């Protein structure tokens, strides 16, 4: 534990003094402490297994970083809903939900403008699917129909007229639980929470540097182990369409590289039987090419249980089934009963 102890000692005894600016900027604890939610929703680091510390070349960030050749949409292309009240940001009236298909089914009870439950004797009118429960004990949780779907989540955002308390700003408001990065016995670093997490609850975003596909390929080729690099690269390909009118969505998708800069979810391990899933989340429709990667719980997660998601979202590698060359495949160490043995 000497290396961890030495690092924490320098943080607590020296980084508040003058003359330590460079060291302070490179300190993981100082980076974490700079998070705006640190005092109420801290991220902590614990190692009770060995003498390892977090990688020296890694930096904690609180928002994505746009790499060379990646740009947000200009202000003239931005737009949001004009809902005067937060209660209007649902179903057919909100511009932010315009790209969703009509849906005549719902697992959510209906309430009127006064918060009273609506008892229907006739079928519900067709309406646009709403991602979150907005009333009752499940308010703010992802609706169950989304849990096993590949549907994107469309949210209101900073260009909208509704308030930050709008029920359709769950990811926009950010992480609401503390997280702990801890050393596992056999899989490096992992992540857990000291509080229980409800099924459907938003956990956090996967952050990193957003780069072009060419840059992603270059980084793969320069990586000592290319498969290891793929653990940290996630394609933003949810809306890739060769027939799109938006040239940014026509070609190869951008990718998020979280290896050297990211948030705490960079240390979340894979499982073939995960308790979280990753979803494409869209704020401003003009920025679909740089949509968020949002992690939601798909099970009730007890406090202290390791947080995991499926890196390949249930896709089995054909090499395992066909008896192909497995020497160059990445073995899975999740240990679950549903383990597929290989990642890719």
Swiss-Prot record:
For this UniProt record, the keywords arranged alphabetically read as follows: Chromosome, Metal-binding, Methyltransferase, S-adenosyl-L-methionine, Transferase, Zinc
Which of this chain's residues are annotated to bind Zn(2+) 5? 332, 334, 339
The EC number(s) given in the record are 2.1.1.355
For the ligand (Zn(2+) 4), the binding residues are 272
What is one GO biological process annotated to this record? methylation
The entry's Zn(2+) 1-binding residues are: 81, 83, 89, 94
Subcellular location per UniProt equals:
Chromosome
Q: Which residues bind Zn(2+) 3?
A: 89, 156, 162, 166
Q: Which residues form the SET domain?
A: 177-312
Where does the record place the Post-SET domain?
328-344
Q: What residues does the Pre-SET domain cover?
A: 79-174
Reaction equations catalysed = L-lysyl(9)-[histone H3] + 3 S-adenosyl-L-methionine = N(6),N(6),N(6)-trimethyl-L-lysyl(9)-[histone H3] + 3 S-adenosyl-L-homocysteine + 3 H(+)
Q: For binding Zn(2+) 2, which residues are annotated in this chain's numbering? A: 81, 96, 156, 160
Q: What is reported when this gene is inactivated?
A: Reduces H3K9me3 levels to about 20-50%. Slightly though significantly affects fungal hyphal growth and stress response and impairs wild type-like conidiation. While it does not affect the biosynthesis of most known secondary metabolites, results in an almost complete loss of fusapyrone and deoxyfusapyrone.
The residues the entry assigns to the signal sequence are none
Residues binding S-adenosyl-L-methionine, per UniProt = 311
UniProt function note: Histone methyltransferase that specifically trimethylates histone H3 to form H3K9me3. H3K9me3 marks chromatin regions for DNA methylation. Plays a key role in the regulation of the biosynthesis of the gamma-pyrones fusapyrone (FPY) and deoxyfusapyrone (dFPY).
Q: Spell out the family assignment given in the record's similarity comment.
A: Belongs to the class V-like SAM-binding methyltransferase superfamily.
- Please state what the protein is called: Histone-lysine N-methyltransferase, H3 lysine-9 specific KMT1
Q: Which organism is it from?
A: Fusarium mangiferae (Mango malformation disease fungus)
């Amino acid at each position: 534990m000497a290396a961890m102890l030495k690092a924490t000692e320098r943080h607590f005894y020296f980084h508040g003094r003058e003359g330590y600016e460079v060291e302070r900027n490179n300190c993981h604890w100082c980076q974490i402490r700079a998070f705006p939610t640190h005092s109420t929703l801290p991220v902590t680091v614990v190692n009770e297994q060995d003498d390892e510390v977090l990688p020296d070349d890694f930096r904690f960030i609180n928002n994505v970083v746009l790499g060379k050749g990646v740009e947000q949409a200009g202000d003239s292309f931005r737009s949001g809903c004009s809902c005067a009240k937060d209660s209007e940001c649902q179903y057919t009236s909100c511009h932010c939900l315009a790209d969703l298909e009509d849906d005549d089914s719902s697992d959510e009870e209906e309430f009127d403008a006064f918060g009273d439950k609506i008892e229907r004797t006739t079928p519900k009118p067709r309406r646009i699917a709403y991602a979150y429960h907005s009333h009752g004990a499940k308010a703010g949780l992802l609706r169950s129909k989304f849990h096993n779907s590949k549907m994107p989540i469309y949210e209101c955002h900073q260009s909208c007229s509704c308030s930050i308390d709008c029920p359709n700003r769950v990811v926009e408001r950010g992480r609401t639980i503390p997280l702990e990065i801890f050393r596992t016995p056999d899989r490096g670093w992992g992540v857990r929470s000291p509080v229980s997490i409800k099924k459907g609850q938003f956990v956090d975003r996967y952050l990193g540097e957003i780069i072009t596909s060419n840059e992603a390929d270059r980084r793969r080729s320069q990586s000592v182990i290319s498969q290891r690099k793929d653990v940290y690269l996630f394609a933003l390909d949810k809306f890739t369409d060769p027939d799109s009118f938006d040239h940014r969505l026509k070609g190869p998708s951008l990718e998020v590289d979280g290896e050297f800069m990211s948030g705490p979810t960079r240390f979340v391990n894979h499982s073939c039987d995960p308790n979280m899933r990753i979803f494409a989340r869209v704020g401003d429709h003009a920025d679909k090419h740089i949509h968020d990667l949002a992690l939601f719980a798909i099970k009730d997660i007890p406090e202290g249980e390791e947080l995991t998601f499926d890196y390949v979202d249930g896709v089995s590698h054909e090499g395992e089934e066909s008896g192909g060359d497995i020497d160059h495949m990445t073995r899975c160490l999740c240990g679950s009963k549903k383990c597929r043995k290989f990642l890719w």
